């Protein structure tokens, strides 16, 4: 994980405080950035339904997604194994079943079927079908919009986050310097791009972090 468990728990506490103020017992987050912010989850798995569930009565978020992607959740998050759940493979692109039928069942199993639940209505990966599955199978839930709830909290950076951003800026500087030094008449564009990518991901001896895939 990029940050400590204490950092993630501090973020979770802030989110729960706002949830309580907005009378939300549970929120379902599908924005990959918000999933990462609260758990550390990092994976290109948003091609299928996935998300995290934050509940006032649970000490940790719940990650849900495809079974094969759950391994990534175990590697990149601080969550206990019991809080990483996955739907069966035969729920994927197999109407009339749908991954959010699994989410709906989880809501009922945890006695949230009469609670106030927030969802990110304007999140790119929260589809109309996702919402329909929830509202049709959880008719007694009071659903409300939690779009930007976490995003506004993310706006105020901790000291650890600021330090990480400063290290990231050094990577950008290294990439720009590499471009400046290698862009010349007659040099192939692909050669320069490779050099830049190497700097952005590999960094140098002065940079404490390494870049990620781009």
State each model region's role:
Residues 1-171:
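A composition/biophysics-driven feature that prefers long, compositionally simple stretches
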Residues 3, 18-36, 125, 172-214:
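Active-site cores enriched in adjacent His and Asp/Glu residues with nearby glycine-rich loops
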